[in-house]
């Protein structure tokens, strides 16, 4: 188990979560990605 990879994966998923929240607050983006915004 490589702790550095785990940390990198956590950072990547944090970035995705931030991007998803930003997308879902923009109607045009949330319409294009309904699977992200529910």
Swiss-Prot record:
Q: Does the keyword Disulfide bond apply?
A: yes
Quote the annotated effect of residue 36 to I: In PeIA-5667; 33- and 270-fold increase in ability to inhibit rat and human alpha-6-beta-4 nAChRs, respectively (IC(50)=0.20-0.48 nM)
What GO terms are given for molecular function? acetylcholine receptor inhibitor activity; calcium channel regulator activity; toxin activity
What happens on changing residue 36 to A?
7.2-fold and 4.8-fold decrease in ability to inhibit alpha-3-beta-2 and alpha-6/alpha-3-beta-2-beta-3 nAChR, respectively
Q: Where is this site: Residue that is not optimum for the most potent inhibition of alpha-3-beta-2 and alpha-6/alpha-3-beta-2-beta-3 and alpha-6/alpha-3-beta-4?
A: 30
Checking InterPro entries in the record gives:
Conotoxin_a-typ
Which tissues carry this protein?
A: Expressed by the venom duct.
Task: Site Important residue for inhibiting alpha-3-beta-2 and alpha-6/alpha-3-beta-2-beta-3 nAChR: give positions.
Answer: 33
Instruction: Kindly state which keywords UniProt assigns to this record, in alphabetical order.
Output: Acetylcholine receptor inhibiting toxin, Amidation, Calcium channel impairing toxin, Disulfide bond, Ion channel impairing toxin, Neurotoxin, Postsynaptic neurotoxin, Secreted, Toxin
Q: Which domain of life is it from?
A: Eukaryota
Q: Where is this region: Ser-Xaa-Pro motif, crucial for potent interaction with nAChR?
A: 25-27
Q: A Pfam family name for this chain?
A: Toxin_8
Which consequence is recorded for altering residue 31 to L? 5-fold increase in ability to inhibit alpha-3-beta-2 nAChR and 1.1-fold decrease in ability to inhibit alpha-6/alpha-3-beta-2-beta-3 nAChR
For the site labelled Important residue for inhibiting alpha-3-beta-2 nAChR, the residues are 26-27, 31-32
Residues forming the propeptide are 1-21
Effect annotated for changing residue 32 to R: 1600-fold and 2.7-fold decrease in ability to inhibit alpha-3-beta-2 and alpha-6/alpha-3-beta-2-beta-3 nAChR, respectively
Residues recorded as bearing Cysteine amide in the entry = 37
Assign the protein's first listed, main location to one coarse class.
Answer: secreted
Altering residue 27 to A: what's the impact? 580-fold and 20-fold decrease in ability to inhibit alpha-3-beta-2 and alpha-6/alpha-3-beta-2-beta-3 nAChR, respectively
Summarize what the UniProt record says about post-translational modification: The hydroxylation at position Pro-27 is critical, since an hydroxylation at this position decreases potency of the toxin to inhibit both alpha-3-beta-2 (1300-fold) and alpha-6/alpha-3-beta-2-beta-3 (130-fold) nAChRs. A non-modified residue at position Pro-34 is critical, since a hydroxylation at this position decreases potency of the toxin to inhibit alpha-3-beta-2 (1-45-fold) and increases potency to inhibit alpha-6/alpha-3-beta-2-beta-3 (1.77-fold) nAChRs.
Query: What does the record say about domains?
Result: The cysteine framework is I (CC-C-C). Alpha4/7 pattern.
Q: Which family does it belong to?
A: Belongs to the conotoxin A superfamily.
Describe the task this protein carries out.
Answer: Alpha-conotoxins act on postsynaptic membranes, they bind to the nicotinic acetylcholine receptors (nAChR) and thus inhibit them. This synthetic peptide potently and reversibly blocks alpha-9-alpha-10/CHRNA9-CHRNA10 nAChR (IC(50)=6.9-54.9 nM), alpha-3-beta-2/CHRNA3-CHRNB2 (IC(50)=9.7-97.5 nM) and alpha-6/alpha-3-beta-2-beta-3 (CHRNA6/CHRNA3-CHRNB2-CHRNB3) (IC(50)=11.1-17.2 nM). It also inhibits alpha-6/alpha-3-beta-4 (CHRNA6/CHRNA3-CHRNB4) nAChR with a higher potency on human (IC(50)=6.75 nM) than on rat receptors (IC(50)=130-147 nM).
The protein, known as:
Alpha-conotoxin PeIA
């Amino acid at each position: 188990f490589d702790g550095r990879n785990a940390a990198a994966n956590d950072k990547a998923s944090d970035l995705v979560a931030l991007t998803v929240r930003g997308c879902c607050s923009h109607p045009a983006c949330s319409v294009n990605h309904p699977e992200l915004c529910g």
